[in-house]
Swiss-Prot record:
Keywords: Bacterial flagellum. Belongs to the FliE family. It is found in: Bacterial flagellum basal body. It comes from the Bacteria. One of its GO terms (biological process) is bacterial-type flagellum-dependent cell motility. This is Flagellar hook-basal body complex protein FliE. GO terms for cellular component: bacterial-type flagellum basal body. Pfam families: FliE. The gene is fliE. GO terms for molecular function: cytoskeletal motor activity; structural molecule activity.
């Protein structure tokens, strides 16, 4: 008799788990595409370079409030972000070449 009650308890737990899984499936999942993320990253790199270039132009024109250390920091940030973008591109190209060389 206790074995039957144990089995019924397990069945109830499984049904509860199945119901919660169905509830989670019905929630809309945000769609984040790889292409969208890549485009956003490229935009951030471009924005960083534009900001650094603007700071350098302001410093060159001797505008008040623009210090050399700010310009150097912005230029270094732009350089690092560009190098990161290049490395990501290199990894993507290497992965693409590896996939293309696989035999089907």
């Amino acid at each position: 008799m206790s074995a039957i009650q144990g089995i019924e308890g397990v069945i109830i737990q499984l049904q509860a788990t199945a119901m919660s899984a169905r509830a989670q499936e019905s929630l809309p999942q945000p769609t984040i595409s790889f292409a969208g993320q890549l485009h956003a990253a490229l935009d951030r790199i471009s924005d960083t370079q534009t900001a650094a270039r603007t700071q350098a132009e302001k410093f060159t024109l001797s505008e008040p409030g623009v210090a050399l250390n700010d310009v150097m920091t912005d230029m270094q940030k732009a350089s690092v972000s560009m190098q990161m973008g290049i490395q990501v591109r290199n990894k993507l190209v290497a992965a693409y070449q590896e996939v293309m060389s696989m035999q089907v």
